[in-house]
Design a protein with these regions (language model features):
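Enzyme catalytic cores with a strong preference for nitrogen-chemistry domains
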Residues: 1-229
């Protein structure tokens, strides 16, 4: 993801948001002959969050050959639905969820969660794109990956910025393997590598990006704390 995640009140600085948008445009320009999917902050200057500040979304973008694929609710980006609000996570402080947007625009979340049609190796594939917590379905009433599969997704991608904790990777493999098996489609989990500071704590991100077959089998996994293609 372009901006990072646990970065505190940097989310409230307009110059930072503008920089994120600038680099997103550069990534879109660079997507010649390849498909790029990345996380970013999206914002709408004509709308406000519930705190009266600029409307921001924890978002993801898919692009190819200089063009952005469609997103949710008429936007050109995917909107995170499941916003964590516990321990170090503070999404509700900064972001507007897909669930809230659907309520605002009188839409149904399960219908808004549609896969993107992306060309990969000259074949049209319906890709279900999720953002981090959207895949941690245990305590949410809406199962985002299953909903995307029900709506036609042939493969699921989870773009994450998930901080390290002891035993977390084992839990990820169990969770995402089960999701792939339940949905009956392959799943790719892509996690951030590096360090971030929210002004109170420093967090490390261990990567360990992984891919799972439709039967839930772990196919491959990247090394911890290593940038990998």
């Amino acid at each position: 993801c372009i901006p990072g995640y646990l970065i505190g009140d940097l989310w409230e600085q307009q110059t930072f948001l503008d920089d994120c948008q600038y680099y997103a445009e550069k990534l879109v320009e660079a997507s010649q002959d390849i498909c790029i999917m990345f996380g970013n902050v999206a914002f709408e200057k004509d709308k406000l969050n519930e705190d009266g500040r600029l409307r921001k979304y924890n978002a993801a973008v898919a692009c190819q050959n200089g063009k952005v694929f469609g997103g949710y609710m008429g936007r050109n980006f995917i909107i995170k639905n499941s916003l964590p609000n516990y321990r170090e996570f503070d999404d509700y402080r900064y972001f507007y969820s897909l669930q809230k947007l659907c309520a605002e625009e009188d839409a149904v979340v399960a219908e808004a969660l549609q896969p993107l049609e992306i060309t990969i190796r000259d074949k049209q594939i319906k890709v279900g794109l999720m953002i981090c917590e959207d895949g941690w379905t245990e305590n949410y009433h809406l199962n985002v990956p299953q909903t995307l599969a029900n709506n036609g997704a042939e493969i699921l991608f989870n773009l994450s910025c998930s901080p390290y904790s002891l035993g977390k990777n084992k839990k990820r493999n169990k969770l995402f393997g089960a999701q792939a098996k339940e949905a009956g489609v392959p799943l790719v989990y892509c996690n951030n590598v590096g360090i971030q500071n929210n002004g109170k704590n420093v967090f490390t991100y261990d990567g360990c990006s992984s891919a799972y077959n439709a039967d839930g089998t772990l196919i491959t996994s990247a090394e911890m704390y290593a940038d990998t293609l």
